[in-house]
From Swiss-Prot:
Active site location: D267
Entry keyword annotation includes NAD: no
Source lineage: Bacteria, Pseudomonadati, Pseudomonadota, Alphaproteobacteria, Acetobacterales
Gene that this sequence comes from: hldE
This enzyme's EC code(s): 2.7.1.167, 2.7.7.70
Protein name: Bifunctional protein HldE
Amino acid sequence: MIDDFRFGRITVIGDLLLDQYISGGVSRISPEAPVPVVLHDGLRCVPGGAANVAVNAAALGAQVHLVGLVGEDDSAARLKETLKLWPTIETDGIVSSPDWTTITKTRVVSGRQQIVRIDVEKLTPLSETLQQRLVEEACRAIAVSDVLVCSDYAKGVLTDEVLRAIIAAGREKGIPVIVDPKRHTFEAYAGATLVTPNRIEAQQASGLPARTDGEVLKVAETLSGQFGGNVLVTRSEDGMTLWQHDAKPLHVASRKSEVFDVSGAGDTVVATVAAVLSAGQTLETAVVIATAAAALSVSKFGTATVSREELSRELLQEMPETGALVPVEQAARIVESWHRHGAKVVFTNGCFDLVHPGHVSLLQAAAREGDRLVVALNTDRSVSRLKGPTRPVQKEEARARVIGALRSVDLVVLFDEDTPLEVIRTLKPDILVKGADYTEDQVVGADVVKSYGGKVVLVDLVEGQSTTRLVRGMQSAPS
């Protein structure tokens, strides 16, 4: 999926942090106090805050212009050194000031257990001169960017004045403006395209509970009223919910993963959404891909990035092999993904007991009508009800395997009812194909497909080909 994306340029502005990890082994308790003694064996420094958003976007292949504020101190030097590892990140927009202390979070860890975190931050109000320099650097970057990200850690860089100026610049350029928020309310983000609070941030800013899907949608609508844009609520194990003014809500289930550390997961989400939008994809597609990126991020320890290769492999896990037999629920998610990428989905159904040239011809003709072909097979019980107790000749697993092996078939599902009506309603195919021995008014699901703009296609059959005829021939053949 993402292998074909051509990522664009992203401006990231916000609070720059340095994340440090002091690691070591613990084998005893201090005699001085009831605390573990850590035998130091390493120090790792990684970009944090807005800088982590930048490296996550760069890891996917985007060009990034990073704008922010650091002090003239050792932490600033370490942060800039870590950013040199990412040649696609432009750091000329980082402003240095002797009046600012580079925000540093130092974690002491043993194994994958965090023992203590030590923060260094002395937050002072920004002078008008510093604010103006930040705006100038941001506007210079926005002029050549495809997406603007404001990473607000509430550390003082994104003042009301800075936000107003850069959001206005993004809107004037006509590019998406994404805000990762930390404020108690979202009025300061007026004009943003998308704000991405987590569940706790959304509850605090709205004053409403956000436990169920319905509650989250109400929260998102309330938050949108504060700034006027769309809202993406990240919900940990409950996935993500996208609320938009001009589209239906989108709930994306979380992907199963072993959670080691949630540090920086929100940065990964906003970076992925920004990168996918910079490639010209839809917001819905960006959210689905960001859900996969988040699952990878929390499976890593500490502030981490997700590479394009890792994300591509993760996304492919959701997509089965061509012709695979999958549950209808999974098929619905796959078809939805195909639709988001502009594919026309074709649907046909049948018992397909003993596959013969007539079946192959029908499926080849069906596949030519669109981009993806889903075949729904009657289960064994369904076939017996329709054809009699001696059928099917082949069990459903065997029939599914044979049909799925045909080059023209992309996906196979089973249905236990006498007709595939419910499957059609669930999958919402664009084109419904049956043999020309039917008339359109006889095709089950024709009215459903046509109700949302789809069509029904009747294809010519190969004369003299019939499973029933084959079965009779086998029964009458001399033993």
